[in-house]
Design a protein with these regions (language model features):
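Conserved catalytic segment of ABC-fold P-loop ATPases
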Residues: 84-87, 100-102
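Short-chain dehydrogenase/reductase
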Residues: 34, 70, 88, 94, ...
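Flexible, glycine/small-residue-enriched loop-and-beta-strand segment within the central core
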Residues: 1-82, 108-118
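Short glycine-rich donor-binding/catalytic loop of glycosyltransferases
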Residues: 92-93, 98-100, 109-110, 116-117
Length: 118
């Protein structure tokens, strides 16, 4: 954790080794979430303009993860993303957009592959 003040964990949350939470903004996990090894959750957004970046300007966008979500190894979740309940996020995925509930998603960028029960 970068700060620890902006993290909310639901019941039965499990994170494997080397989980990184860059929590300048709120990161919320629902119940029964499984996080595989080497996953990263980042809320900080830095400007593309070099002068603003050099001046230390940044904003934070929250990350929200529903209940019953499983993250495979090495997933990166970017600022401002919401992941719905009952999702599976495949190993090595880079999640840059919201993922709807009850879906399996994977890739870089991460995209929905199918419904969970298909």
């Amino acid at each position: 954790c970068e700060y620890g003040d902006f993290i909310t964990l639901g019941n039965n949350f499990f994170a494997n080794y080397n989980c990184k939470l860059v929590d300048g903004g709120q990161i919320t996990f629902g119940d029964d979430v499984l996080v595989g090894p080497d996953c990263t959750f980042v809320t900080a957004v830095h400007p593309t303009d070099p002068e603003r970046r050099r001046a230390g300007y940044q904003v934070f966008k929250p990350i929200s993860v529903g209940s019953n979500v499983w993250f495979g190894t090495g997933v990166v979740v970017c600022p401002g993303v919401t992941i719905g309940d009952n999702c599976v996020i495949g190993a090595g995925s880079v999640v840059v957009k919201d993922i709807p509930a009850n879906t399996v998603a994977a890739g870089s960028p991460c995209r929905v592959i199918r419904k969970v029960n298909e």
